[in-house]
Amino acid sequence: MKFRPTYETSGDLKKETLAVKRFIASFDGDVDFAKLPIQYKMDFCLIDNKTVCTFVEVKCRTNKKTAYSTYIISMSKVVASKSYSDIGINCILLVQWTDQMGWVDMSHNEWDAKIGGRKDRGDWQDIEPVIHIPISEFNIVGET
C-alpha cells in the first residue's frame, strides 16, 4: 500500500504554532493549546481548565487577505467540524495572511461547495470537493 506524502514541514508547523499563540494572545486568553494527531483533521485544540473547548485548523498564506474573494478549504475539514460540533466541540478556521489574521466558525455556516484544489504538487488527491468561505465572513484579529 502506498501512503500519501506528508506535505507539512517543520517550518509550516512553527508558523502555525505562532499563529495560534497570537490568536490566543489577542483575546488575553488564559487557555492552553496542543497539537492534534492527524486523524482529528484539525491542527490544534484549545484547552481551558483541562477541558477541550475548541479545535483550530490553521492556515498560513503567502498572499494578502484581499487577494481572493473566498477562502477554499477541503470539504472533509468542514464535515469533520460539523461532527465535532455534534459533541459540543467548536471548530474554527484561523488564517494568517501576509497582512492580517482572521478566523471563522466552521461549525455553524453553510457555504458553496465546488471541485477545486491545488495543481502544483502533481498529487491527484489535491483536486477534491472544496468549500468556498467568503473572506467577508472572517473575524479579523488584527494587523501583523
Language-model features, listed with the residues they occupy:
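Beta-rich catalytic cores
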Residues: 40
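Acidic-basic catalytic patches of nuclease active cores, encompassing PD-(D/E)XK
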Residues: 1-36
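Conserved catalytic cores of phosphodiester-cleaving nucleases, focusing on short active-site segments
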Residues: 44-64
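Intrinsically disordered, low-complexity terminal regions enriched in charged/polar residues
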Residues: 102-144
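Mg2+/Mn2+-dependent nuclease catalytic core
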Residues: 61-84
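Nucleic-acid nuclease catalytic cores
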Residues: 82-110
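A structural signal for short, well-ordered beta-strand segments and their strand-loop junctions
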Residues: 34-35, 55-57, 92-96
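Alpha-helix C-cap/termination motif
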Residues: 26, 47-49, 84-87
